[in-house]
Amino acid sequence: MTIEETTYAKILAKKAKECPDRVAFCSEGQCYTYAELDKITDVFAAKIIGFGIKKNDHVALWGYNCANWFVTYLSIIKAGAVAVLLNYSLPVKDLADLMELTDAKFIFYGNNRETSKDVDAAVKLAELSKLSKDKMFNFSGEAFDFKTYLNDSIDTSAVKAITESDNPRRDAIIIFTTGTTALPKAVLLSQYGVINDGIGYGDKYKDARGESICNTLPMFHSFGLMVVTLYLHDAKTVYLHELIKPEEIVKIVDKYHTPDMSGVGAVYTALVEHPDFDIKVIPSVRICLIGGSVSTPAFLMRLEEKFTHATFLNGYGQTEASPALSMSSPTDSIEKRATSVGSLLEGGEIKIWTKEKGFMSTGEVGEVVARGYYLMNGYYKLPKEKQSIDDEGWLHTGDLGYVDEDNFLHLTGRIKDIIIKSGENISPIEIEQKIIENECIKEVKVMGAPHPVTSESVEACIVLYDGKTFDEEAMIAELKTKISKFKIPSHFFIFDSFPLLGNGKLDQRGLKELMLKRLKKLRLEHKIEKGFHVNTTTVDNDELAVTPVLGLIGTFAKEIKFSEKRTDQILEAVKAMLEERILNAYTDVGQITIQIHLFKECMRIQFRDQGDKYFVEDDENAKNTAKTILKYVSNYKTEKDSKGVSTYSMDFNWENGFNIVDFLADK
């Protein structure tokens, strides 16, 4: 591999001379040859400078995958600015936070999820970002035709001056990590890193690479951007569609006979299930680049079995590495491609490291660290102690893995995803690989959940193939033959589908929230079945205690959605009981304890004291309070234990089909 000190502008100028009429990008009828792309981006870059955008200014780019998106991206960089790539699936408020985080001064936008719901979404984003309307430009095909720039006579000398002296290693791109904190990290990438990472990645399959690719990866994410950059560098043709839908992808492959494809596992699975897959996809596709989360061996083998003429190439990386760090090759065996994430890219370094032992030997597990030409320039506006590249230049990925004797990288988990159960470290990936071997399982994700005894429990989320049923007992029996008993999931949660991020990757945080909610519901159901004790209050035998107790119970009754009328009735019954025990007891009752319990059918309020046994229906002097209590309770009973302690229970059934488990699970 030859590392190149080059830029997008120099690549375009070269290709415009070598193959001017070859189509570079095409999406939904908007196609640009290399000569057109070079000319149009020069003109647009000049206009961008005319908008008042200066070198190194941060400029936001927001829209679905399309040729015009890439035209705008190239033009921003040709103008010497920094392209801030926004996720087309995020709501306006979240985007405004990212705009503020990165100090973006201008918005270029096209069609996206928000504008499809609200035509004023871009205006609202500008307002939230404190930008005037003249700091916005709509590049969508419906709003603007870049082909008009082919006849534009604007002076592009300022652009030429910038591109001729442009430093390939400067900050040129900001891409956001899909983090779990309130705000993602803003990763600063260079043209040098993205272009050379693409070259290194492409070298892994250069002899098998076709003349065109159907790219389904979002270009606002590093993998999608790197792939299209590679195909641009090699003068290939990139086909796109705004919406990553199976029917649209099938149309592209069928129409243009694209031999190469790029996508995440969910996209390939959806294509397999498309009715025209056999006649419109299989005949053309030969190379399938797969990104996103790590593919299990069984999953990748199943896909390759379905794509009968294609080879699936697995890889690994992260945004901070532009992003690829390793990649498999078509000449690798299916076993190697399925069980590893490929061998290292030429020119880069990967080692396995632990804090305790330093660099590890072949086959030993530790954190994957990387060093080389593809690394980011850093996180924007984060101090040194929060950067993930150490003083020796090693990027700490946060992923666990090992390198085998053939120099292939194997991932065993993510440090933050490791489940710690009773002091044992458990890798979710190990369990997932065994679960997915079951023929009924389409997708699986194993996660940890808080547990009061073992610290964490092992929980599995699964998606079934259509028409398949899940036998949990059989699955557990099967797993007992493959993994240690303590690693077997406590529960299997079945989903119709997993939530996805805008780039098609699994929304792991969203899935975990759903799983934890369902787990909470299961645990609540167990507690509610036996009676869930939620409050105990003890008061003196004094009429002054009545009001605060009523206030407590009234507030609680309203909180759990009893109607105002029913709440008043509950309070009347409680008041009658308190007054009877406090004011009219036959003997000294001492302190009174009031407890609230929740059951599936009702709320139970219990009163306990040392007074004489009290049957409201038998005592002549308690008729009025008895009538009040019996009028409003759903059930009533009184008991006395062996020590002579009396307990009076009043049940109040839930209203209008209210489900206490669902209610508490949402809290």
Where do the PLM segments sit?
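Structural core segment of the AMP-binding/adenylate-forming
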Residues: 51, 78-149
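Conserved AMP-binding A3 loop
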Residues: 33-35, 163, 172-196
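Gly/Ser/Thr-rich phosphate-binding loop
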Residues: 233, 258-263, 272-336, 349, ...
